[in-house]
């Protein structure tokens, strides 16, 4: 349902793997090394003891499920996504589709307040939940980015985190809902199927049998373009990653191709915070990451330039290749 990428994830090679788990309450000297190793080998990792209050997470999940449980006509009041707002099946502007409905929000407080009026019957409650969640995950993102910089031996460990705390940061929050498969014999269509995880735990977990393995695309193969993505999902699986840009680390860390499948009889909710720089910010490697022996692989460019290229291409297209340094003059700059 989504255009094939240059290096698609082959279904026959899909294997279950255990992602690295980073305990942020462990010794300060250990976390930077573990994060760098996880980024080099997987591009994904799980974080525990992260400090994001559980009540803030639950409030955000409750508001999300409450919105997606509304009739279609009510949800459409918050759309169409252009790019912000409510979207269903259509992803972006180039014809990509998937079995997903979503809310895309700018993290600017004023924008959240205005959008909430078309999203919720209680705009202040929704706006408060979103703002609290964004503040908490932004603080976590800053901590991870600073640990990452430390693990890379970058002298200025706040070189990345400063970009996402800038008042003009282009960070986003995307709430994704993947409905249950229509052909699942044990599909849960009751109102309780659209409840936060702490409510779902009281429900009977259905056995999907072979239907649960259907590879229907919820959100097709892609790489997140931002600096860092923090993903929270409920207890329903569906994320697949491909083990392989990397501008700010000069190719040392690579943004991993991944996709989401609607392979469950339960509704899947994911909340993704995309930590991004301001539009005017220049994207280039810190001095420690580019040396005469390992010159810059990419020419400097602004985040606005990259976003323009991103919106001109399909979901699975390679965008970073457009910015690769082509000659000695570009590398020297």
Feature annotation, model-predicted:
Residues 1-333:
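Peripheral, non-catalytic segments flanking oxidoreductase cores
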């Amino acid at each position: 349902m989504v255009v094939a990428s240059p290096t698609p994830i082959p279904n026959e090679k899909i294997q279950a793997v255990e992602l690295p788990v980073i305990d942020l309450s462990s010794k300060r000297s250990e976390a930077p090394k573990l994060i760098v190793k996880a980024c080099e080998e997987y591009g994904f990792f799980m974080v525990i003891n992260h400090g994001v209050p559980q009540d803030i997470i639950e409030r955000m999940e409750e508001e999300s499920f409450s919105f997606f449980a509304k009739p279609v006509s009510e949800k459409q009041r918050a759309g169409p996504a252009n790019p912000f707002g409510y979207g269903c099946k259509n992803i972006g502007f180039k014809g990509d589709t998937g079995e997903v409905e979503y809310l895309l929000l700018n993290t600017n407080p004023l924008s959240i307040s205005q959008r909430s009026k078309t999203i919720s019957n209680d705009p202040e409650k929704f706006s408060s939940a979103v703002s609290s969640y964004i503040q908490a995950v932004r603080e976590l993102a800053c901590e991870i980015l600073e640990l990452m910089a430390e693990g890379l031996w970058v002298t200025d460990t706040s070189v990345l985190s400063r970009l996402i705390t800038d008042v003009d940061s282009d960070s986003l929050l995307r709430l994704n809902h993947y409905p249950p498969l229509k052909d699942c014999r044990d599909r849960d269509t009751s109102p309780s199927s659209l409840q936060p995880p702490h409510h779902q735990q009281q429900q009977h977990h259905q056995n999907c049998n072979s239907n649960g393995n259907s590879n229907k695309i919820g959100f097709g193969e892609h790489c997140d373009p931002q600096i860092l993505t923090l993903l929270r999902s409920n207890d329903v699986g569906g994320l697949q990653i491909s083990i392989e840009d990397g501008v700010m680390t000069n190719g040392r860390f690579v943004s991993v191709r991944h996709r989401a499948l609607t392979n469950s009889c339960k509704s899947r909710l994911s909340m993704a915070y995309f930590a991004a720089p301001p539009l005017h910010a220049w994207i280039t490697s810190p001095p420690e990451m580019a040396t005469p022996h390992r010159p810059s692989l990419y020419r400097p460019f602004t985040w606005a330039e990259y976003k323009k290229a991103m919106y001109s291409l399909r979901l699975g297209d390679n965008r970073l290749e457009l910015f690769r340094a082509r000659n000695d003059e570009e590398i020297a700059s």
